[in-house]
């Protein structure tokens, strides 16, 4: 990742700390991955705090595929089958079947309906019957171990919201340009500045977590 672009957001450690602080304040975060991987930026939010306005922003400026990152434990609690048995996607992205809240939504497409679906899925006492399948929210199963196991946006989202003190559930969506192309680092950084989002890379988060583990041992 081009460090010149990122230097305005502090050191790698500071970028992670700023991301954690933003999530605690109810703001979104821009998470960039490696230029040699997907080379994209995802807007991420804590599932517990995401607002209808933030969802509307995400739908308006994102790919439209709004994903709810969950742990394997939560996936089992909700009895969500994986979308395919044999995952042949380039990065092994862990999509489950799509979901909709069983109650409190109309078509399920609006920002408010998607928030209702997310709240239903992350409720402490959530059960499979609280959700209909398919729907307009795309759950993603994170790998245990987070970014230290898999350097994906799914795991980064779970790691960041957990570090911020929230339950391990977060929302992500890839940022796109107005012409429909994928936003790359310069566009992602400009968007983040405009919308008061800190910028952090998955590489930053890997380093941060490795340092945490060294300290703990």
From Swiss-Prot:
GO terms for cellular component: cytosol. One of its GO terms (molecular function) is manganese ion binding. It comes from the Bacteria. InterPro entries: DHBP_synth_RibB-like_a/b_dom, DHBP_synthase_RibB. Mg(2+) 2 binds at residues 38, 153. NCBIfam families: ribB (TIGR00506). Belongs to the DHBP synthase family. Catalyzes the conversion of D-ribulose 5-phosphate to formate and 3,4-dihydroxy-2-butanone 4-phosphate. Homodimer. This is 3,4-dihydroxy-2-butanone 4-phosphate synthase. It comes from Cronobacter sakazakii (strain ATCC BAA-894). The gene is ribB.
